[in-house]
Regions:
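Residue-level signal for functionally critical sites in structured catalytic/ligand-binding pockets
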Residues: 26, 68-69
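Hydrophobic core of alpha-helical transmembrane segments in multi-pass integral membrane proteins
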Residues: 9-17
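Feature marks short, highly hydrophobic, charge-poor N-terminal signal-anchor/signal peptide-like helices
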Residues: 1-9
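Charged, low-complexity intrinsically disordered regions
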Residues: 31-66, 73-206
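Transmembrane-cytosolic junction motif
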Residues: 16-40
Length: 206
């Protein structure tokens, strides 16, 4: 019986060791790929990001771009965590509207009580596709409506269509950004996303 127990412990220890080595190998290879991407764009690279900080930053066109990781700890007995990748592009002429545009709906917000009960703000712009897809907040509703011209609304919808439904596009007074639902191993996807956000920032500053 003791021998069986030792065999079982040895088996599980071996499995843990294998997965640990694979995870370490993935992290090493992923960091190398990120470093190569940073060098391609002439960005500064932070090798000590620890999966919860800025990884690289620099300039594309006229805009500053940041790529970062965010690790969120889940409240559970297993103490699980999830890591997201963020790509953000700063606006050169930030507005003072208190603008905050984020995806809405069950996939983005989870179960929510009606806004009439929670008092959660959602400015209606008057463009059905845009209003249904995004929650819009700001200090002055009329100023926000004036700021979100048909051209800018179309640019946001076009960018979201290029990204896909699982990539969380959001906008504020200061920046446009995308949150990926996990680590992205395809460096070209990260590069293309940064360029897309630069294009979107240009549409808001045209």
């Amino acid at each position: 019986m003791v021998a069986d127990l030792l065999c079982m412990v040895g088996f599980f220890a071996t499995v843990v060791l294998i997965f640990s080595r694979r995870a370490k190998r993935f992290q090493t290879n992923h960091n190398r790929a990120l470093d190569a991407l940073a060098k391609h764009h002439g960005f500064g690279f932070n090798p000590n990001h620890g999966w919860n900080a800025t990884v690289m930053n620099g300039t594309i066109g006229k805009h500053r771009c940041d790529v970062s990781f965010e690790t969120v700890r889940r409240r559970s007995r297993r103490n699980r965590s999830r890591t997201y990748l963020h790509v953000s592009v700063s606006l050169n002429g930030p507005s003072q509207l208190g603008l905050h545009i984020t995806p809405q709906g069950f996939l983005s917000e989870g179960l929510q009580l009606p806004d009439s009960l929670t008092g959660n703000q959602d400015i209606i712009i008057g463009e059905q596709a845009f209003d249904e897809k995004y929650r819009i907040k700001g200090f002055d509703e009329n100023a926000v409506r004036a700021h979100l011209t048909p051209k800018r609304i179309h640019a946001v919808l076009q960018a979201q269509a290029s990204l896909g439904p699982l990539h969380r596009l959001s906008l504020t007074d200061q920046q446009v950004s995308v949150r990926f639902p996990g680590l992205i191993s395809d460096m070209q996807t990260i590069s293309n996303t940064a360029k897309l956000l630069v294009w979107l920032a240009d549409q808001f500053e045209a």
